[in-house]
Amino acid sequence: QYPIEVPGVSNFTFLHTAFNSVLQHQGSEPMPEGDFREFLVQKLKLVGMKPEYLDRPVNTGFSGGEKKKNEILQMAVLSPRLALLDETDSGLDIDALRIVSEGVNKLRRADNAIVLVTHYQRLLDYIKPDFVHVLLNGKIIETGDSSLALKLEEKGYDWLEK
């Protein structure tokens, strides 16, 4: 929910190191800094961040919205096959929610999975899930489509506790 701050490590260094680690794991050559910076500028546009963010320490002094955008930027750069976004809508104003949601939607692919944890239906106004699962005491007690989220918003959780 609350991305950690990493004082002394710039976003650029963090992302470049992580990206090259992925390339190395895949048996590819590392990407030179100049090429990576060009690649990264395109990814910044996805989340509405300015290039100046790259020189700032990771999440240090970032607003809640900036931290969430930075998480989506990391997803855009690293292209994970599985991403877990825990309450990514927490603390976001409506503009930041829209930008973060657009980023998540653009990163959806047939070869990846995004697990999105939220307590509020408003995120689902922007991101249409394939499935909605309700957890209670560590177990999935109900599964459905986005209409399940609307029902939860309307009725709460009490009707599920049998």
Regions found by a protein language model. Name each.
Residues R81-E87:
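Walker B motif beta-strand of ABC-family P-loop ATPases
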Residues Y126, F131, L135, K139-K162:
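Conserved beta-strand-loop-alpha-helix hinge in the C-terminal portion
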